[in-house]
């Protein structure tokens, strides 16, 4: 069985933790009654081994094994610097 590793792209909200970042993932959801598209954000904690990210950076993260209670994503690359 081959599972595709999930990758997401988002904006770094916080890098105050050591070797960890908080990434905001934005998605658009259609309102069930009115049909308007609404922005929804999900905050994900990710592992940043080299502490290279700053707040405002656009990054790519991928899913991995659980690294702590809240971290199960790791940094792949920094797409654009803030």
Curated annotation (Swiss-Prot):
A Gene Ontology biological process term: translation
Oligomer and partners: Part of the 30S ribosomal subunit.
Family under the similarity heading: Belongs to the universal ribosomal protein uS17 family.
Record function comment: One of the primary rRNA binding proteins, it binds specifically to the 5'-end of 16S ribosomal RNA.
Gene3D superfamilies according to UniProt: Nucleic acid-binding proteins
Assigned GO CC terms: cytosolic small ribosomal subunit
Protein name per the record: Small ribosomal subunit protein uS17
GO MF terms held by the record: rRNA binding; structural constituent of ribosome
UniProt-listed SUPFAM superfamilies: Nucleic acid-binding proteins
Cited HAMAP family: Ribosomal_uS17_B
Keywords annotated in UniProt: Ribonucleoprotein, Ribosomal protein, RNA-binding, rRNA-binding
